[in-house]
A protein has these predicted regions:
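N-terminal helical cap/lid subdomain that shapes the substrate entry/recognition surface
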Residues: 1-61, 68-69, 80-83
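Acidic, low-complexity intrinsically disordered regions
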Residues: 9, 19, 44, 75, ...
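Asp-based, Mg2+/Mn2+-dependent phosphohydrolase catalytic module
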Residues: 64, 76, 80-179
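Short, well-ordered coil/turn segments that N-cap beta-strands
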Residues: 71-73
């Protein structure tokens, strides 16, 4: 399985769907290149939900606290336009965002500066007044080049501490509602 995910349905191939390539086209290309793995390639597509790691509970709790405090919430994700609607159904907390820019819909992926600019322009965000959180150092570096404050996410505890330092959360508080 590790070989299959490294050599066939790898991150570079998956990023092409995140950039807007239709899944049917992406899987057809792989089936032509790896006909002996056609069944697994098709299964990867039809069973992709099983590859999702799920939400990080501590992060969802932080998001709930920010929402409860009235903090404006926007999101930017590298995700296929075909599969993101399913993620919206699986993860109710995605409804808490005022807006979400999805790479597959924009035909751009992070860390391309154009996708960050699109978010800033679409939602009239002042880069100097925004905090961008990502688990990728290269994505954080990209937003910092645009004048945004970036935070490289490692774990919910570190994020919570940083948000307390910025005055966005209070020390020792936790939201209990996840509506």
């Amino acid at each position: 399985m590790e070989w299959f995910l490294r050599e066939v349905c790898n991150s570079e191939w998956n990023e092409q769907q995140d950039a807007g390539r239709p899944w049917a086209e992406g899987t057809a290309l792989l089936r032509a290149r790896f006909p002996e793995h056609a069944g697994l390639i098709d299964a990867y597509h039809t069973r992709w939900k099983e590859t999702l790691l799920g939400p990080i509970d501590g992060s969802v709790a932080i998001l709930a606290e920010l929402k409860a405090r009235g903090v404006r919430l926007l999101a930017l994700t590298n995700w296929s336009q075909e599969t993101f609607p399913v993620a919206r159904q699986l993860y109710p907390f995605l409804q808490w965002f005022e807006g979400i820019v999805v790479s597959g819909e924009e035909r751009l992926v992070k860390p391309d500066l154009r996708i960050y600019r699109r978010l800033l322009e679409r939602y009239a965000v002042d880069p100097a007044a925004a905090l961008y959180i990502d688990d990728s150092a290269r994505n954080v570096a990209a937003v910092e080049a645009l004048g945004m404050h970036g935070w490289w996410f490692h774990d919910p505890a570190g994020l919570r501490e940083h948000l307390v330092e910025l005055g966005l959360l209070e020390r020792g508080t936790r939201a209990t509602s996840r509506d």
